[in-house]
Amino acid sequence: MALERSEVEKIAHLARLGLNESDIPQTTETLNSILGLIDQMQAVDTQGIEPLAHPLEATQRLRADVVSEHNQRDAYQAIAPAVESGLYLVPKVIE
């Protein structure tokens, strides 16, 4: 599927791109090459191939899940203007 000039102009308009007259031929060529690549990928037979969440079968080294900060909720709420039942009270904004 090859795009024509009018289709590229329409795509540029919908994407709110300002293309100069001199840019349209190269943009058309670039979009056509992208669509060609998509056609090549769609032509590959993927029947029987299990989908991957990530193309590399690498495992990530994760750090240990340890507490690095202590709970300072009481200290923060002590300086808050209004607190009730552990929640910060704020002025009503929507009626």
From Swiss-Prot:
Entry keyword set: ATP-binding, Ligase, Nucleotide-binding, Protein biosynthesis
Listed GO biological process terms: glutaminyl-tRNAGln biosynthesis via transamidation; regulation of translational fidelity; translation
TM stretches of this protein: none
InterPro entries from the UniProt entry: Asp/Glu-ADT_sf_sub_c (IPR036113), GatC (IPR003837)
EC number: 6.3.5.-
GO molecular function term, any single one: glutaminyl-tRNA synthase (glutamine-hydrolyzing) activity
Catalytic activity: L-glutamyl-tRNA(Gln) + L-glutamine + ATP + H2O = L-glutaminyl-tRNA(Gln) + L-glutamate + ADP + phosphate + H(+); L-aspartyl-tRNA(Asn) + L-glutamine + ATP + H2O = L-asparaginyl-tRNA(Asn) + L-glutamate + ADP + phosphate + 2 H(+)
Similarity remark: Belongs to the GatC family.
Known role: Allows the formation of correctly charged Asn-tRNA(Asn) or Gln-tRNA(Gln) through the transamidation of misacylated Asp-tRNA(Asn) or Glu-tRNA(Gln) in organisms which lack either or both of asparaginyl-tRNA or glutaminyl-tRNA synthetases. The reaction takes place in the presence of glutamine and ATP through an activated phospho-Asp-tRNA(Asn) or phospho-Glu-tRNA(Gln).
HAMAP family given in the database record: GatC (MF_00122)
Subunit structure: Heterotrimer of A, B and C subunits.
Protein name, as recorded: Aspartyl/glutamyl-tRNA(Asn/Gln) amidotransferase subunit C
